[in-house]
């Protein structure tokens, strides 16, 4: 995988570190992110993962995908 290119991967293959799971997304931020997804069908924030498929950024987008039962999501790999 090359950094800077969009790839589609299964959400089940992305490993979400515990520190993301322990972080509460603020209500205002969550409502904004979910509203954006409902209006556009796209995530407002990119999902960034490393070469081992560990989530680096985009936890709110991953959470939306999980809640909505989305099986594959667009991601960008970072070094």
Language model features: what each stretch is:
Residues 1-79:
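Short, charged/polar connector segments at secondary-structure boundaries
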């Amino acid at each position: 995988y090359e950094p800077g290119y969009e790839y589609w991967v299964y959400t089940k293959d992305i490993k979400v570190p515990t520190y993301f799971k322990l972080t509460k997304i603020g209500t205002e931020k969550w409502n904004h992110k979910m509203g954006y997804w409902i209006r556009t069908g796209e995530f407002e924030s990119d999902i960034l993962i490393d070469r081992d498929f560990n989530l680096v950024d985009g936890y709110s987008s991953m959470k939306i995908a999980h809640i909505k039962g989305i099986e594959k999501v667009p991601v960008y790999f970072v070094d």
